[in-house]
Swiss-Prot record:
Keyword Calcium among UniProt keywords: no
An annotated GO cellular component: plasma membrane
UniProt protein name: Ceramide-1-phosphate transfer protein
Annotated TM spans: none
Top-level taxon of the source organism: Eukaryota
A GO biological process held by the record: ceramide transport
Function text: Mediates the intracellular transfer of ceramide-1-phosphate (C1P) between organelle membranes and the cell membrane. Required for normal structure of the Golgi stacks. Can bind phosphoceramides with a variety of aliphatic chains, but has a preference for lipids with saturated C16:0 or monounsaturated C18:1 aliphatic chains, and is inefficient with phosphoceramides containing lignoceryl (C24:0). Plays a role in the regulation of the cellular levels of ceramide-1-phosphate, and thereby contributes to the regulation of phospholipase PLA2G4A activity and the release of arachidonic acid.
Location in the cell: Cytoplasm, Cytosol; Golgi apparatus, trans-Golgi network membrane; Cell membrane; Endosome membrane
UniProt xrefs under Gene3D superfamilies: Glycolipid transfer protein (1.10.3520.10)
Single Gene Ontology MF annotation: phospholipid binding
Family per record: Belongs to the GLTP family.
Cystine pairs: none
Catalytic activity: N-(hexadecanoyl)-sphing-4-enine-1-phosphate(in) = N-(hexadecanoyl)-sphing-4-enine-1-phosphate(out); N-(9Z-octadecenoyl)-sphing-4-enine-1-phosphate(in) = N-(9Z-octadecenoyl)-sphing-4-enine-1-phosphate(out)
């Protein structure tokens, strides 16, 4: 990522998800990927503990940027237009028993980002609503087990949960968001997290309508 990781403001990153949505409730993919880049900077600022997520996210963002700059870029302006295009042209692999024909489809790629966004949303919400003496590692593990864990092998799940024990105390973690005191960070999360939640909910509904939530 360009520039030092500490030179970002998490509130700006979270509120940037507001730009993802049009008045019609469409999710604009350029803003979606830009917002995710900001989240990657946040994850990287916390050290190697989240590298297993941030590295995967970066690879998915590269796929989406390739699709946005490719010959069919007009179909990848919004999440809705992408889903309509790939589903109607059978560019989505639905059967896990068959050899993948479209491993880098936009639908599959965004689904991975969508799942990771849910984990981060739940984790940050847990930080916001928890008591001062809450263990960051426990909050992170609970969010992970409720979201991404279902898609990882047993070995990966064990390694991830061990890594979470290296997370700093809640107060230190909140102050790492560059929003002043931990109290100010909590207030900021209350203002900014609804934007992520709205993007997540719209994406979840769209994928459910097209039976895309369990793509292999």
């Amino acid at each position: 990522m360009d520039g030092p990781e500490r030179d970002f403001n998490l509130k700006v990153v979270l509120i940037s998800f507001k730009k993802c949505l049009t008045d019609k409730g469409e999710v604009l993919l350029d803003h979606y990927t830009a917002s995710w880049k900001g989240l990657v900077r946040f994850l990287n600022s916390l050290g190697a503990v989240f590298s297993f997520i941030s590295k995967d996210v970066v690879s998915k963002l590269q796929i989406m940027e390739h699709l946005r700059s490719g010959p069919q870029s007009e179909h990848y302006i919004s999440l809705q237009s992408m889903v309509a295009y790939e589903v109607s042209n059978k560019l989505v692999d639905r059967d896990s028993r068959s050899r993948p024909r479209h491993p880098n489809s936009g639908c599959r790629t965004v689904l991975r980002l969508h799942r990771a966004l849910h984990w981060l949303q739940l984790f940050l919400e847990g930080l916001r609503t928890s008591s001062e003496d809450a263990r960051t590692s426990t909050l992170c593990s609970e969010a992970y087990n409720a979201t991404l864990a279902a898609y990882h092998s047993w070995i990966v799940r064990q390694a991830v949960n061990v890594a979470f024990h290296a997370l700093p105390p809640r107060k230190v973690f909140l102050e790492a968001m560059n929003m002043g005191s931990s109290e100010q960070a909590v207030e900021m999360l209350g203002e900014a997290l609804p934007f992520i939640e709205q993007v997540y909910d719209i994406s979840q509904k769209l994928y459910a309508e097209h039976s895309l939530l369990d793509l292999p």
